[in-house]
């Protein structure tokens, strides 16, 4: 398992192109506290995704912040990204590991018990549970799991993979960070609350500070 700092996953979605060029958004987050970046595009062509991923990777070069690609192992491989984030309907993590290699970061989405059980046997480096709350960033057919559901799924993951970082995603704003971290999250994934904020740099920094404070408060 590769060591992944999952405290703040800034998720750069293609729909944010109306805010600013995606590489600019990624760099702003990388310079102000994001510990991992995820590029997501549910509708773009493969060529567009590879070009965008390469541009983001170039923009954040030298920051030390890794870039993972949502869903697409082929795009991760072609763009030279640091890894991939996979959902239940995507390529399985074992196959992705064979293609991308041992040093690649592989993350998994966990929405329910079946996903958690699947993750237990997969060569993944982190898992992200969600959606935890309602979100405006994505049409989600699944009901939010809430804090209680998050706690249950996290416990299953930690039982089987005690060293795996577990994050939370969906509807997480600054006010919800303390509760999510207190419930056991090792970090959070954020889209709108960072990238549609009036000041992206400040929003990223504020999230990072809130996460670090909540993690410190959780220590025994």
UniProtKB/Swiss-Prot annotation:
Cofactor(s) essential for the protein: Mg(2+)
CDD domains: TMP_TenI
Cofactor binding note from Swiss-Prot or TrEMBL: Binds 1 Mg(2+) ion per subunit.
Domain of life from the UniProt record: Bacteria
Gene3D superfamilies reported in the protein's UniProt record: Aldolase class I
Catalytic activity: 2-[(2R,5Z)-2-carboxy-4-methylthiazol-5(2H)-ylidene]ethyl phosphate + 4-amino-2-methyl-5-(diphosphooxymethyl)pyrimidine + 2 H(+) = thiamine phosphate + CO2 + diphosphate; 2-(2-carboxy-4-methylthiazol-5-yl)ethyl phosphate + 4-amino-2-methyl-5-(diphosphooxymethyl)pyrimidine + 2 H(+) = thiamine phosphate + CO2 + diphosphate; 4-methyl-5-(2-phosphooxyethyl)-thiazole + 4-amino-2-methyl-5-(diphosphooxymethyl)pyrimidine + H(+) = thiamine phosphate + diphosphate
Pfam family for this entry, one: TMP-TENI
Pathway: Cofactor biosynthesis; thiamine diphosphate biosynthesis; thiamine phosphate from 4-amino-2-methyl-5-diphosphomethylpyrimidine and 4-methyl-5-(2-phosphoethyl)-thiazole: step 1/1
A Gene Ontology cellular-component term: cytoplasm
First-level EC class: transferase
Binding site residues for 2-[(2R,5Z)-2-carboxy-4-methylthiazol-5(2H)-ylidene]ethyl phosphate: 135-137, 171, 191-192
Keywords: Magnesium, Metal-binding, Thiamine biosynthesis, Transferase
Disulphide linkage map: none
EC number(s) given by UniProt: 2.5.1.3
SUPFAM superfamilies, per the entry: Thiamin phosphate synthase
InterPro entries assigned to the protein according to its UniProt record, in alphabetical order: Aldolase_TIM, ThiamineP_synth_sf, ThiamineP_synth_TenI, TMP_synthase
Residues engaged in binding Mg(2+): 71, 90
Entry GO MF terms: magnesium ion binding; thiamine-phosphate diphosphorylase activity
Entry's family note: Belongs to the thiamine-phosphate synthase family.
NCBIfam families linked: thiE (TIGR00693)
Function: Condenses 4-methyl-5-(beta-hydroxyethyl)thiazole monophosphate (THZ-P) and 2-methyl-4-amino-5-hydroxymethyl pyrimidine pyrophosphate (HMP-PP) to form thiamine monophosphate (TMP).
Protein's name in the database: Thiamine-phosphate synthase
Organism annotation: Agrobacterium fabrum (strain C58 / ATCC 33970) (Agrobacterium tumefaciens (strain C58))
